[in-house]
A protein has these predicted regions:
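Secretory/organelle targeting and membrane-embedding segments
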Residues: 2-229
């Protein structure tokens, strides 16, 4: 949560006129937050047998990201004001549906109880009971021992009405905020395809944080230590 790009979420929302007016149930179809890891939990079996993936990353890291996306505009962009806005939002969050899983081989780790049902994977859907978000699914997906390490927020906008195009309806706009492995964000838009006619295709406008700042980007723990000092 101390990563530079995470601090960018509120700034992207509230300092860009093109986003905040669209940040609601009338324009957004769904929000999906994914936090996948390649490593297994063989070195953390004692912790995982007690708490599982829900208490490992869902109740803290993922809910914090959900709150940053869903909160109302804070009085200011100070940490205290943002904290209040996030807390108010989380009071409105309710579980809707979902399922849990466990990666193959977990039961073979030393220290795992025989027949353990501890979850190492979660695919959960929540709803937010307020005027802005009523009816919009917020999906949290996370797991251990997966193919790719990735933390990303995908905000999918509702499709536009059918126009006189060959591809109808056209692809939906999507804002993607990538935290790991490559920090940055991208906005997928529709544009005219080369040639005659009115066929459209998805194009991407991308901001790559590491491409610009590279080694100058402070590490997450570095940010925390500076705040403490």
């Amino acid at each position: 949560l101390a990563k530079e790009i995470v601090g960018n979420i509120a700034l992207v929302r509230f300092t860009n006129r093109i986003f905040e007016p669209l940040w609601n149930k009338e324009n957004i179809e769904s929000v999906t937050i994914t936090l996948n890891e390649k490593l297994d939990v063989s070195m953390r079996v004692g912790f995982f047998e007690k708490f599982g993936v829900l208490k490992d990353v869902v109740q803290n890291h993922m809910f914090q990201l959900l709150a940053l996306v869903g909160m109302e505009e804070p009085e200011s962009l100070t940490s205290d004001a943002i904290g209040i806005a996030k807390a108010e939002l989380l009071e409105k969050v309710a579980f809707k549906t979902g399922y849990l899983g466990q990666y193959e081989g977990y039961l073979q780790h030393q220290g795992v109880e025989q027949g353990s049902k501890v979850a190492t994977y979660a695919n959960l859907e929540f709803e937010i009971d307020n005027e802005r978000w009523h009816g919009v699914p917020f999906r949290l997906i996370t797991g251990k021992c997966l193919k790719e390490k990735e933390t990303v927020i995908k905000i999918k906008f509702k499709p536009v009405k059918c126009l006189l195009t060959k591809s109808c309806p056209s692809d939906q706009n999507e804002l993607r905020i990538s935290i790991v492995p490559r920090a940055g964000f991208a906005l997928e838009l529709n544009a005219k395809k080369l040639g005659n006619g009115n066929e459209v295709m998805p194009v991407e406008m991308e901001y790559c944080h590491e491409c610009i700042y590279g080694l100058y980007t402070p590490l997450a723990y570095e940010t925390i230590l500076k705040a403490v000092i």
